[in-house]
Design a protein with these regions (language model features):
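Signature for HUH/AEP ssDNA processing cores
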Residues: 2-159, 166-185, 267, 271, ...
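Short acidic (Asp/Glu) and glycine-rich catalytic loops that position anionic groups and cofactors
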Residues: 39-46, 161, 223-227, 251-257, ...
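Short Gly/Ser/Thr- and Asp/Glu-enriched loop/turn motifs at secondary-structure junctions
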Residues: 108, 156-161, 202-207, 290
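Flexible helix-coil linker/hinge segments at domain or subdomain boundaries
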Residues: 184-221, 241
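Long, charge-rich alpha-helical interaction segments
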Residues: 222-268
Length: 295
């Protein structure tokens, strides 16, 4: 098991190094002309979502870090329509009215493999739980390399690991289906009792945790601390996975939802957890006369 550096809940790196880490991650995703959204769900006591659009990695990182340690910060993995910059030009609005939809994405640049440790919902991972996710990541990346896949960008997400393989796909229903089938095949092959691959992240407008910022689930405790996400490996070149390799892995497997929406006990995770993880803003209403809670 590799040692995983984590911060005490009360500390954080010096701001210059922190800014450099976030900028390095964003810069690894960026191409000239890109625009991306920063989104911060439920950042205040009223449950508002903050959002802003940026055409510069440096400006994005500086603005996003104002929320670091206050709420979980996310970024659209794929570039958005540049016209969306006019919603909030290189700044974050604390009460966003609109966020990015699948139709707003120009192209699919990355296959997002989100590896999470199996644990109860709403809490951070222990070192042992995190190690299970690391083992899955290492097995997956080594075996895909043996099959001719290029080197991915890898990150500690806080409670698991991100693996990002460059791809070059149009934003079409066919591409969404292919990505969904690839994730389903990977989950079928690599999921364990201690860690799973999230198969629900195939949509084009998927948001990803902003690497370099704190990831907070529940309260920080000695055995379940809040950890700062960080880059692990950035390849020297971003060679896209060919569509042929994607199809070979996907085979005829249909896209499917895996039990990542369930807790360790097998119970279905609360809808509020799923909405928050997806970065969807919501308001919970009191149960009506039939006992139904509306969102």
């Amino acid at each position: 098991m590799k040692a995983v550096t984590q911060e005490p809940p009360t500390g954080r790196p010096a701001r210059p190094s922190l800014l450099a880490e976030v900028t390095r991650f964003v810069g690894a995703l960026w191409r000239p002309g890109d625009v991306r959204e920063v989104r911060i769900p439920k950042h205040d006591q009223w449950g508002h979502t903050a959002s802003g659009y940026f055409d510069s990695p440096d400006t994005l990182a500086q603005a996003a870090l104002e929320y670091d340690g206050k709420a979980n910060i996310y970024l659209t993995l794929n570039p958005t329509d540049p016209a969306l910059l006019a919603r909030s030009v290189n700044r974050i609005k604390p009460r966003a009215e609109n966020t990015t939809s699948d139709a707003d994405i120009l192209v699919r640049r990355f296959l997002f493999i989100d590896i999470d440790s199996v644990r109860c919902s709403g809490i951070s991972a222990t070192e042992q739980e995190l190690a299970a996710a690391e083992d899955l990541m290492e097995r997956l990346t080594h075996e895909l390399a043996d099959q001719g896949w290029p080197d991915p960008l890898t990150c500690l997400s806080g409670n698991g690991y991100y693996v990002l393989y460059p791809i070059d796909l149009a934003n079409t229903p066919e591409a969404a289906n292919l990505v969904g089938r690839v994730l389903a095949a990977l989950a079928q092959r690599y999921d364990t009792a201690g860690a799973t691959i999230d198969t629900t992240v195939a949509n084009a407008s998927r948001i990803i945790g902003l690497v370099g910022t704190m990831k907070m689930k529940g309260d920080a405790t000695a055995d379940r601390p809040h950890r700062r996400s960080r880059l692990l490996c950035v390849p020297d070149t971003f060679d896209p996975v060919s569509e042929a390799l994607l199809e070979k892995l996907a085979g005829d497997r249909p896209p499917q939802s895996r039990p990542t929406s369930r807790s360790r006990s097998g119970r279905v995770r609360p809808l509020t957890d799923l909405l928050t993880d997806a970065g969807i803003d919501y308001r919970e209403q009191p149960p009506d006369g039939s006992g139904i809670t509306w969102y």
